[in-house]
Each structure stands twice: as structure tokens, then as C-alpha cells.
């Protein structure tokens, strides 16, 4: 089996989730000046009516690395809420973060809400009073470490990176699960990985590997003639198409579709990367009611029940009964993202081994105010 099977999180497992960085003290010395809201009492249908009265439009900046990578989410949202018109502009999280900073500095914010990787940016925006606090329905069911206690932001889905393998090229029993498995001569010329110095999530993976295996691991890995790409989704796509057999810098559903050409599996011994993807509404949002509807829908049971990996709600079961219970520590990833000096040093160190990243931004999105 690729995951543990139990009906719900144990207290011990939940304690692991809350390791390292409680949100209550994460923002810094500046006080949170805005009033902490009560939990939303309106239903999704009532929120829908309010959003339509506001105009029915919504602009979201979403983290990702495939063009129009949230098209399915847009379609599902518009179908669930007739009359709404949502646009989720997908770009690399690091680019969206600085894009939002630039827009705020210019006094013209283009998005109403955002869900991107950089939780350190959300902490800063909260401290600067840039976020509109909101606690959607079901707030009390969201794991405590997946939400800001003041309602400034909350996790809307859980992502994990681990092995993805092509099922026609590698059997599950032979698939590499731990970092050392990727050094097996059988996988020479068959590995695709994301540039770690281009992606903070993958950078964390390599930080963990080097801390456990030493820098000699990089020399051995490079002898495998790895193909390096920009973005985790392009790495997964290369495996799905059969261009390469394996990667460990990608995500995938815990339960693969029957016709899938790839499969996602967790390590046997190593720890693995996981994090709740944070989302927030901006204080200067042009469509705050629509943004509240969107966040409420994302964390609703009807959406969380369809999670590809783990839900953010404790009252929702994971696919196949899998639980978030071993060898993963989201709090450590949060602390890692906040130490920007260490990140920059690690990027430079890895670039000395791998070389400068090559290729364009895979989303094709450019500029401070990109065309939506």
C-alpha cells in the first residue's frame, strides 16, 4: 500500500501536523489591527446571492505551473453558481507573490483573492494590513495548523510531493520510493526533476535530502543524467507521457484513475514534503463578496470530499481512508519558507551543481498586470 489506512487522524498524528510553527505567533511583532471576524453563518446559496448583487465577477491569482491550470476549477465553480464569472490566473507562486507586491505598491490591485505557495508572503501581507479577515463556514472543522487564528488566511487543499512513476515503464514494486532509490543504475537517463533553485517546494525537498544524505548525493544524482525542467507539473507530465520513467518532484492523486499512465506513491522510509496551500482575500478586493463565496466553496465538504490528496477538514475522510499521519511535517516547511537568507544560500549552492535553470516560464504569464 502507498498510504496508511485509518478512518481518521489520531491525536499523535495531529500533533505531528502541528509541529514546529504554530500560526498564532507566526506574523511577527506588529499587531493585527483588524477586527477578528466571527465564523460565517450564511450558506453557500446566500453567499452566491450576495456575490451576484455585487456583480458576479471574481479574479483569483492561483499558484501553478501549467497554462490555464485551474480551468477545471473555473468550470466547476461557474456550474455550481450560475451567473458567476470567475477567472483563476495561474502562474508560478513566486511570480504571483511579487506581482501582488508591485500592484499594491502601485495602488491598483488586480486580483480579489490568491492561493499561492508562499505562506511567508501571507504573513507579511497580514502584518501590513493588506488582507481581509474571513472565517468561512466550517472554520471550526479546519485543522488548527492549517489556518491563521485571526482569519487572515487558511489552507484550502493539502499538497504533497513524492515519487510519480510511469506505470508502463516501472512496476510499483520496482518504483523508487526513497531518495537513494533514484541512484539505482536502472534509472539512469530515465529521471526528470524540477530545478530546485526555481521552486521553493522542490528546494525544501533537496534541503531534506542533502541534510540526510550529504552533498555527495548530488554528485551521484547528476551521474544519472537527469533531465531538469521548470515546474513540478511539467515533470509529472513528462512521466505521464512516457518521456521519462520517474520523478520525485511532483504531486498526484492518492488514488490513481483507472486509465492513468502514472501513479503517485509515498516514501517507505524518508520524510516527504507536504503543505496546506494558503488562500486569502485582499482588503482592496473589488469583489469581496465573490471572494468570500469562492473560499467558502473551496473548503466546503462538497469540494473537500473530492480532494486528490488530503482534505483540510477533520470531518472529511481521505481517499481510500488514507490519513496524513507519518513522515511529513508541514510546520517545518513553513519555517523553511520564512528563512529567506537560508533559502538564497541553498539556491546558490544547488546551482553550482546543476547549473543555471534553462527554459521559459512554463505558464507563459508575464508582467505586473498580465492579460487575464
Regions found by a protein language model. Give the residues of each.
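Periplasmic-binding protein-like
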Residues: 144-145, 158-161, 187-198, 218-222, 228-229, 298-320, ...
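Conserved C-terminal helix/tail region of periplasmic/extracytoplasmic solute-binding proteins
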Residues: 40, 335-372
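Extracytoplasmic ligand-binding site segments that recognize negatively charged/polar headgroups
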Residues: 59-74, 87-101, 108-243
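A ligand-binding cleft/hinge motif common to bilobed small-molecule-binding domains
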Residues: 120-124, 245-263
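A bilobed periplasmic-binding-protein/Venus flytrap-type ligand-binding module shared by bacterial periplasmic
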Residues: 162-169, 207, 275-287, 306-307
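Extracytoplasmic "Venus flytrap"
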Residues: 36-45, 54-72
